[in-house]
Amino acid sequence: MCDAFVGTWKLVSSENFDDYMKEVGVGFATRKVAGMAKPTLIISLNGGVVTIKSESTFKNTEISFKLGQEFDEITPDDRKVKSIVNLDEGALVQVQNWDGKSTTIKRKLMDDKMVLECVMNGVTATRVYERA
């Protein structure tokens, strides 16, 4: 099922991302720079390992994981988190845990777009990507 996510995706819209980053605890300057970035996501699958590369003027990051297995991640805003990604009703659902806090990033496919819903403490950001 992860095969449907494989490809290159370009951010086309972002809603409420600054409020979400603020809730996560991202500082003002980092929020402003990150909020202006238009990342490209490159998702690949190799032998059951999913890799998500994010490339932007803000920062380039890469995570690789197997579904259902916890892994260490350093986020673009330099948080050290424990992440786990599961497939839930066709969506890739990532949970990041750090310092007693938790956020969920849900990636789902809708109408040839990939929609990211980032949620923390009731604050939701929606970011929409189209195939590049």
Curated annotation (Swiss-Prot):
UniProt KW keywords: Acetylation, Cytoplasm, Lipid-binding, Nucleus, Phosphoprotein, Transport
Cell location: Cytoplasm; Nucleus
Annotated positions of the Phosphoserine modification: S13
Protein origin, superkingdom: Eukaryota
Stored InterPro entries: Calycin (IPR012674), Fatty_acid-bd (IPR000463), ILBP (IPR031259), Lipocln_cytosolic_FA-bd_dom (IPR000566)
Record: residues binding a fatty acid: R127, V128, Y129
Modified residues (Phosphotyrosine): Y20
GO annotation, biological process: brown fat cell differentiation; cellular response to lithium ion; cholesterol homeostasis; cytokine production; fatty acid metabolic process; fatty acid transport; long-chain fatty acid transport; negative regulation of DNA-templated transcription
N-acetylcysteine found at: C2
One annotated GO molecular function: long-chain fatty acid binding
A Gene Ontology cellular-component term: cytosol
Positions occupied by motif Nuclear localization signal: 22-32
This protein's record includes keyword Nucleus: yes
Entry domain remark: Forms a beta-barrel structure that accommodates the hydrophobic ligand in its interior.
Role according to the record: Lipid transport protein in adipocytes. Binds both long chain fatty acids and retinoic acid. Delivers long-chain fatty acids and retinoic acid to their cognate receptors in the nucleus.
Family: Belongs to the calycin superfamily. Fatty-acid binding protein (FABP) family.
Quaternary structure and interacting proteins, as annotated: Monomer. Homodimer. Interacts with PPARG.
Stated name of the protein: Fatty acid-binding protein, adipocyte
High-level lineage: Eukaryota, Metazoa, Chordata, Craniata, Vertebrata
Gene: FABP4
